[in-house]
Amino acid sequence: MIYGNVEKEIIQLNEHTVWSGSPNRNDNPEALAALPEIRKMIFEGNHKEAEKLANKAIITKKSHGQMFQPVGNLNLSFEGHQNYTDYYRELDIEKAISTTSYVVNGITYSREAFASFADRVIVVRLTASKAGSLAFTTNYSSPHKIKKFSVKNLDLQINGTTSDQDGVKGMVEFKGITRIKLEGGKIAKTDTSLSISETTAATIFISIASNFNNYHDISGDEEKRAEDYMNKAFGKTFANLKAEHIKGYQKYFNRVKLDLGTTDATKLPTDERLNNFRNTNDPQMVALYYQFGRYLLISSSQPGGQAANLQGIWNNRLSPPWDSKYTININAEMNYWPAEKTNLSELHEPFLQMVKDLSITGQQTAKDMYGARGWMAHHNTDIWRATGAIDGAFWGMWTAGGGWVSQHLWEHYLYTGDKAFLASAYPALKGAAQFYVDFLIPHPNKNNWLVVNPGNSPENAPAAHDGSSLDAGVTMDNQIVFDVFNTAIRAAQILKKDASFIDTLRIMKAKLPPMHIGQHNQLQEWLDDIDDPNDKHRHISHLYGLYPSNQISAYRTPELFEASKNSLIYRGDVSTGWSMGWKVNWWAKLQDGNHAYKLIQNQLTPIGNERGAGGTYNNLFDAHPPFQIDGNFGCTSGITEMLMQSDDGAIHLLPALPDVWPSGSISGLKARGGFEIMEMVWKDSKLIKLVVKSSLGGNLRLRLPNDLKLANGATLKEAKGENSNPFYFLNETAKPIISEKASIKAPTLAATKLYDIATQKGQIITLSL
């Protein structure tokens, strides 16, 4: 993180594996014996007593999760630079380069910085417009208790060890090296600092490494790694490093282009545009925010690295909010919603690998705590892939973390068609289903439906349960089990495996509770009709079935579609940053572009401090508050869903176009089945050109807002029946149970055209008016 200070610049340093603690487990061995009594209490309506027992017997008595921690700061001091003019600062997200410039005594000083993926170093170039006039002092600082600063030869070095946390000894050892290449001038050293004088330009190289190999192995040599990174990079010229950095970054970033139009507002600084956004016409601000989300994912989730956490990879606190770890009851999943559809599939890999890791560590949790096969995780995890229940039963007594994250494995397959990947992911998909096969239990008061007990609707509780969140057969649990069973069935069929297991899953799936529509015309959050229309809770977990799942559809389940809309209206718009990001996706799925845009306006509300409602900080980081990166990713996903959706049997184009974007274009989006939207142009809210590439072949079903023709003038074939493309197979959602007090209206939808086009692998289809 580059602060951009003039006299006292701070380069705040993070490395993705620098976490507190060391390999550990946090299961509670008392859980299995207490499980029958907890279930009995819940079935009998004694929710509060069940929560008390769960706090004692299920919530961990060990670690409640470890913390993502900073390395420290590299400080640059420029004596005499306190009086400056012409200050300018920018982040070029097309190149991932930060620049700062200013003038002191008629001399222009410039700083240019980037983090090179290829060379594993941070590079900062300092220049002065007058020869020999650049001078500065540099040193490390760090909040860690165990740390050492030194200078070896002319290398500025930091060594440190991460913190102990919750009785787990901090054993991640890290090493940082700063080496400076001068163009003229002098360099002097003390025991802990370097001083540069009489130079015209200086290039600072920073390498960082740790001893972390994987979640169960910290035997790496951080000293050698940091030295190797430095030595490899230091021999290259700045021009070469910069060119390689830009090439490596733009390999991902340049895949998607979005144009929603521009106005004079683009001439203003970003913070002023943010402050004015609600009251001005600035469509390019939305495009900037959209691409900023992609920039953040590219920067915080490189293949082979750790997944983006609650703060991506940017944290300056030894003890950050919520430990800056992985909250898997929404936040971590939201981080990766843009990955596939915004053409960043490779950057999904760190999260997919984390899911595979959890499918290993979660096996012992499933067995020891719940007597089940397969694997599971609760609502949080960390770099050590802990899967125990933490934070108290109100939050932590939730067994669906593993089930939800496993769906990302399936999504990656649906977009790429990579059968080798599916084969590698199948044990995790099967294991998630195996857990539920053993964990589900008949509900004695509800038609013997198979339900999750104990469960909860994340972080929320109905007033009828005396403030307890614990319940049986919660809507979100039912929806996740439905998805877990279906993806395991489909994966097994594709891989021609486990026929008898498929039969078991089908039988059990038929016994899951259907969704319920309650007395307030709402989609019920719980099996009982106890929703409060005045509840404004940030989590609206029962709408998982609308998004990111596709169980609720405007065309297949109109009653559930309308009930979801009612639930969303009851909850309101303004909330935490990430919640508003999720709502953009929901309103896009509800095909209401104007309401989705209203949520974008709410999210792009400037937040000046870490209190109050959610919004956006001046640097465009999402504000929960405090900073959480999930809202950035959620909104980027939602903007994509406004322009293209591909989860309801067809590629639906412009499903939620707001009035404020009457004309525009986008290129590079990915749809399920290996289709790429190479170009989509609309004018006066009408689609005028579409170019689609089919990388896998198969039927291309398009749902369009208006008629288009093939490039040769031929008319399109009207689609009928189910889509023959297997990547667009739809699982039938059970008919809902509707309260006698409800009066559900049929949804009002814009007219669309549905067409089928047979494609071959590699074929490009062009359509126009």
Describe the role of every protein-language-model region.
Residues 1-394, 400, 405, 411-413, ...:
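Aromatic-residue-lined binding/catalytic grooves and analogous aromatic/hydrophobic interfacial grooves
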Residues 342-346, 409-425, 440-443, 485-501:
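Inter-helical turn/loop segments and adjacent helix faces that build the functional surface
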